[in-house]
Amino acid sequence: MKILIKTANAYICVHDRRFIMVKEVNIRKVAVIGCGFVGSTSAYTLMQSSLFSEMVLIDADRARAEGEALDIKHGLPFAKPMNIYAGDYSDIVDAAIIVITAGAAQKPGETRLDLVNKNVAI
């Protein structure tokens, strides 16, 4: 894939001399996939950074993502305004950055290789 034109929020790409993509990117939008300990901490830190105006949280448990979005919104009085919400994969097609924190925790006696195989499935 080769990028022919790169602007502030659009990319035009070709592959094998064929046009394959024009993608609008919202440079002020970030997505966090996985709302466990790492994901929720990452989302809170991203909110505090004031780099983004929109954040989408995705988790296999939709209610957990909604709860984390509400919890993070409570910190907004100390940061710049941001639209934070639980969404799905269709909401992040234009995100500038996607942070993937989804994964299983390592159990006692489980090898790192076993954990990797489990996380590949996730």
Predicted regions mapped to residue ranges:
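A short, basic/flexible loop-to-alpha-helix module at the beginning of a structural domain
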Residues: 20-28
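N-terminal Rossmann-fold NAD(P) dinucleotide-binding loop
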Residues: 39-40
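Conserved NAD(P)H cofactor-binding loop of Rossmann-fold oxidoreductase domains
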Residues: 102-104
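Glycine/threonine-rich flexible loop motifs
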Residues: 107-120
